[in-house]
């Protein structure tokens, strides 16, 4: 009989980490019959799945570990583990800085967690495995278990882009594409469990080149076509994309696959070609605009979100103004924007940077004000329209109100029977609020 253990997992960072955290619990459950707990003080195993994109995210890890240190003193059998990209980047240094940590594991070694725990218990020595094994983790992970009507499916790992500011190629490793048939099988399993919306994940997801059993290679567009044919799957998203691989095949899929959500997240990072060159993004603003124009010729009302970095080394006011101009021209929806964070070991970390932090903060505020204005206008334009909502559950503020999301990721709250949870519903939008919409069930 397997020993039951309570597991607490804290997830920082991107959707890929959310996916990995779910798989951590599944692989532990297969060996230890685990149950999740929301209270780390009640756990037998505490894991933190980390992000290293920005310095503040990295410091969050050690802040959390500091909170858990005291529990370890009163419970010697407690297992504390650090996974994710900070684990890959720091490795043994985590143990040196926090000796009470038992496990340090990378994104590619999740499947080894049970064995690492057993080795720790046997040897009483901290275990570190941040390797990039040739046999990918997907081969050893158990069948996914759906939690609701939406699910993430990882189709590739790693990145070969080596943008000058980014640590992902160093922490996630080179690109590894999951076999085409394996992805379809996972999507079919999830559909049988009631999943209706799939989000395909990868650090550079639209560069997916999955090996097929017939010896050919499938790109993301072909994969999307096949997933759309699976009974029960009614909405498909993908993230995160790179403009260079946003291909004509993928653009054409928006014309032929109605299940493909009418929303695209396509990180451009900046609006100045000079800055893009220094970022090693390998495309121009004109090339980006041309792809957006082709997409909008097919889906005129598609909403587009992005990622932006403000204050990159050498950024001038003229460069920044070009970024604002791009945001206005494309009419970007809700987006992620940050002040550049120097990451050790990346080429950009060595670039001279003499822009005062106050200037960077001012630019970030101006950018975010513009993005928020765009988003509010888009939300107000939705009032009076009928939207197809995937009902996630009840509102955080009122258990009698249902809540779900539109294709363009707007949260909509409306009255309805709880039997609609996990289903699609048509809702007329009646009011636009700063962070959500209100509607009426049709």
From Swiss-Prot:
[4Fe-4S] cluster 2 binds at residues 159, 163, 166. GO terms for cellular component: cytosol. Residues 380-442 form the TRAM domain. The keyword Transferase applies. Keywords: 4Fe-4S, Cytoplasm, Iron, Iron-sulfur, Metal-binding, S-adenosyl-L-methionine, Transferase, tRNA processing. Residues 145-378 form the Radical SAM core domain. CDD domains: Radical_SAM. [4Fe-4S] cluster 1 binds at residues 14, 51, 85. Binds 2 [4Fe-4S] clusters. One cluster is coordinated with 3 cysteines and an exchangeable S-adenosyl-L-methionine. SMART domains: Elp3 (SM00729). Residues 5-122 form the MTTase N-terminal domain. Its cofactor is [4Fe-4S] cluster. It is found in: Cytoplasm. GO terms for molecular function: 4 iron, 4 sulfur cluster binding; metal ion binding; N6-isopentenyladenosine methylthiotransferase activity. Belongs to the methylthiotransferase family. MiaB subfamily. Catalyzes the methylthiolation of N6-(dimethylallyl)adenosine (i(6)A), leading to the formation of 2-methylthio-N6-(dimethylallyl)adenosine (ms(2)i(6)A) at position 37 in tRNAs that read codons beginning with uridine. PANTHER family: CDK5 REGULATORY SUBUNIT-ASSOCIATED PROTEIN 1, MITOCHONDRIAL TRNA METHYLTHIOTRANSFERASE CDK5RAP1. Monomer. This is tRNA-2-methylthio-N(6)-dimethylallyladenosine synthase. It comes from Francisella tularensis subsp. holarctica (strain LVS). The lineage of its organism: Bacteria, Pseudomonadati, Pseudomonadota, Gammaproteobacteria, Thiotrichales.
